[in-house]
Amino acid sequence: YRTVALIQTGGAMIDASLRVLRTDVAGMPIEWIGFEEAVRLHCLDQILYPMGSVLYHVHGGINARSGEQSTLAIHSIICTAGQSRAYLKRLPSYAPPLNNSTLFRRDANLCLYCGDQFRNTDLSRDHVEPLSKGGRDVWQNVVTACKRCNHHKGSRTPEEAGMQLLAVPFVPTHAEYIYLSGRRILADQMEFLLAHFPRNSLLHSRLNAGDGNSHPQRR
């Protein structure tokens, strides 16, 4: 079961787990933010324009003259002021931060040795070229592996261990990383992110096939 945090705003309860997709001035996805941060950006006049559906209606104070209560609509996607990060798409050396949760999601929670699907808690990060042999802890040298396969492989290469790698590890683009780090992505947010994926994106192909958001199976 998933625990949903509910916050009372203006007398109504809202699901605080829904995230807002923030973009830069050029429309490039930057990060996921909560509704509190979205309200703060509104107050600082940092939102250029909203996109997508309305997630929340946040109620403010009551105007002493008109007696009307202010209401702020928080959209699923917001374009914000500031420096454009579009240059990230043109940097061949750009690599997003590496962490296990996004790595496992990149590989669809599949062990890339045995091919079975697992929960995050039953998975591990495997270095194709072991660190002890000079391998690096980078996207293109790490794959998702179940703990049994990782233990069997040990500090050997797949060839030395007689194990076949089922897919070639790749470095996600910035937009792909935003997708990988997201949770409960809404349809309009997903459509927006897909438009920023490369044409040859492996993630794009997987999502079109309908298994990009598959959940780990219980084992």
Task: Please place each PLM-identified region on the residue numbering.
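Short metal-coordination and nucleic-acid-contact micro-motifs, chiefly zinc-binding Cys/His arrays
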Residues: 104-109, 138-142
